[in-house]
A protein has these predicted regions:
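Bacterial Sec-dependent N-terminal signal peptides
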Residues: 1-46, 577
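Signature for the C-terminal beta-barrel architecture of outer-membrane proteins
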Residues: 40-42, 53, 58-76, 86, ...
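Histidine-anchored nucleotide/phosphate-binding helix
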Residues: 81-83
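Short N-terminal amphipathic alpha-helices
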Residues: 91-98, 131
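Aromatic-lined carbohydrate-binding surfaces of glycoside hydrolases
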Residues: 99-102, 139
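Extended catalytic core of nucleotide-activated donor transferases of GT-like folds
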Residues: 117-118
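Well-ordered mid-protein domain cores that form the structural environment of catalytic cofactors
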Residues: 122-169
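Long, intrinsically disordered, low-complexity segments
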Residues: 538, 545-547
Length: 577
């Protein structure tokens, strides 16, 4: 009897999925041209597959997936099929089919499960109008008030499902209005997002040649039902943004300010009815660049800028329901040992313990690029490229009242130091076949403040990297890296290396390893080795890797996802046609 009920339930689910897919294709393709040749001309398809077979390993431990309560299904795969069809010159129908079977890769959100339609949309575009119904992505300004994007490696897809219209006036004014709910797995958020954006290109109005001046204003609202009796805050939270972008010849500058209305503070998925605060953000970027020289400086201050479509999702590690974009503004390093201690932006309020009170961050970074000219003492025959970066981040200074759950902050006061990073990179070409990179990094990482680890002390590290590439001719080359990390504790004493062989522009192989000779209980005396290769032809790329994955953060563009320690075989396939 139970088996019969289970079979009937499965059949109902399958019928529901099939009905959704059939309905979608009827809507999208009802008005499409019937000619096969016309269909092929307007069709573009992209496919991506990321899969892994996780091994039991005496060093990294037996395979287990606590989130899905599974220890048996060692094979996992994330697959994406994206189809875009352009028809009647102005319309584009898009659909993305996703499969996470039998489960998604380790430490992706459990909302990504099974096989289903991930996103679908119908897009209309003319010379001055752009409209979308279905799933869409958008960004207002720098993203400090709103950003929707997809990053498959990080497991992020916070597309909005609803509608968006953009209109351009007089070749100088851009207006956008949107309404929708966040994508959460294959479902949508309870909270609703609506917003308006305007951009004014004043240089186009005044016909300036060497000067660019743009101003922008944005509004974003979030409405979510409140499940509390007599709430002290409104269901709707309003955010406003104003910004100016200016450039003149080699100089550029931009400034943006965001304010967020009062809303409940959320901690550990609990919405507080007594801790109600507003939020704000300030971002300033300025720089100067010319041939052989560049200088760029960024300053940012965030106070209570955690912003989610569903309040209880605040601070979730999968970035589900996130409305705005607050990446860590530090240098994005390329090497294994320079990415062990990575800074993540501290934009939220945390009053969980009187010994750890946080309400935001303040700091910035400086980038300096300089090319030493050829035929000089330091430049040599081919010149020398130098890049310097420094970043510093701290908590907000102010008065904090843990007992009454309240605070007041100083506008430009720097509190507890969170993180600093100073790096120097020197690139040198010795002859047509040999080139090298020398890289040095000094980092300060306040583990207690960043991770909420009360027993941890700040870690200071110095990292050195030497890299050389030698061209062998006929597309062949070898690349060698040597890395070393020293710290002020006995826990971290790392060494690493990489060897890469490029057989041609299409085929490459590599092997790398990092090893901690320190006393850290989670990583000590373990070789985190990897070996693999890739093949590329046109828009198709196939990659294969076997090795160990160190527990830590994978970061792209200042946004990070935690990955657990694991051992296994991974494969990636990307295709476009």
């Amino acid at each position: 009897m139970n088996s019969m009920k289970s079979l009937q339930t499965t059949q109902i689910n399958l019928n529901t999925i099939l009905l959704k897919k059939i309905t979608l294709f009827i809507v999208f393709f009802h008005f499409l041209p019937t000619s096969y040749g016309q269909i092929i001309d307007g069709l573009s398809v992209g496919f991506e597959s990321n899969s892994a077979w996780y091994n039991d390993d005496k060093k990294t431990g037996d395979f287990t997936d606590e989130a899905n309560n599974d220890q048996d299904k060692h094979f996992r795969a994330n697959n994406y099929l994206k189809i875009d069809y352009n028809f009647l010159s102005k319309f584009t129908a898009s659909v993305q089919i996703e499969s996470y079977e039998p489960f998604a890769l380790i430490n992706y959100s459990t909302n990504f499960k099974g096989t289903n339609l991930g996103t679908y949309s119908l897009h209309y575009k003319t010379s001055n109008m752009d409209a979308t119904i279905g799933h869409f992505y958008e960004q207002f300004g720098s993203g400090l008030i709103l950003r929707n994007w997809e990053d498959r490696q990080l497991g992020i897809n916070n597309a909005l499902f609803g509608g968006k219209v953009s209109y351009r006036l007089m070749d100088a004014v851009d207006l956008t209005a949107l309404y929708g709910n966040h994508r959460v797995g294959f479902e949508t958020s309870d909270g609703t997002i609506f917003g308006f954006n305007s951009e004014f290109e004043l240089d186009s109005v005044f016909k300036w040649d060497e000067t660019a001046l743009n101003i922008g204003f944005s509004y974003v609202g979030r409405e979510e039902k409140i499940d509390l009796e007599n709430p002290n805050f409104e269901p709707t939270t309003n955010a406003f943004s104003g910004r100016v972008d200016f450039s003149y010849r080699n100089f550029y500058s931009s400034v943006e300010y965001v304010t967020k209305s009062e809303d409940a503070i959320v901690q550990v998925n609990q919405v507080s009815n007594d801790f109600i605060k507003s939020g704000n953000g300030f971002l300033l970027n300025t720089g100067y660049s010319k041939k052989g020289f560049g200088l760029d400086a960024t300053f940012r201050r965030l106070e209570n800028m955690s912003f989610y479509s569903d309040r209880k999702k605040s601070g979730n590690v999968f970035f589900e329901n996130i409305i705005n974009y607050t990446p860590g503004l530090t240098k994005q390093h390329d090497y294994l040992l320079t990415n062990i201690f990575v800074y993540q932006a501290q934009s939220a309020v945390s009053f969980l313990d009187p010994g750890l009170l946080k309400v935001g961050e303040i700091g910035g970074q400086l980038d300096l690029f300089y090319n030493i000219k050829k035929e000089t003492l330091l430049g040599g025959k081919y010149g020398t490229k130098m890049a310097f970066n420094a970043s510093y981040w701290a908590g907000l200074k102010g008065t904090f009242d843990y007992a009454n759950q309240d605070y007041e902050t100083d506008v430009f006061g720097f509190g507890e130091k969170y993180f600093s990073d100073i790096s120097l990179e020197i690139r040198k070409k010795w002859n047509p076949k040999w080139r090298s990179i020398v890289y040095f990094v000094n980092q300060y990482y306040n583990k207690k403040e960043i991770e909420g680890n009360f027993g941890a002390k700040p870690i200071v590290t110095n990292i050195g990297v030497v890299e050389s590439t030698h061209k062998l001719g006929k597309g062949k080359s070898i690349r060698i890296e040597a890395q070393r990390l020293w710290s002020d504790t006995q826990d971290h004493d790392w060494i690493g290396g990489t060897f890469e062989f490029n057989l041609s522009s299409k085929i490459s192989f590599y092997i790398n390893d990092i090893y901690n000779n320190g006393d850290d209980s989670s990583t000590s005396k373990t070789h985190y080795y990897n070996a693999g290769g890739s093949y590329t032809k046109g828009a198709t790329r196939v990659g294969l890797n076997y090795g160990r994955q160190r527990a830590g953060l994978v970061c792209i563009g200042g946004v990070c996802r935690f990955v657990p320690e694991a051992t296994g075989l991974t494969a990636t396939v990307t295709m476009a046609f």
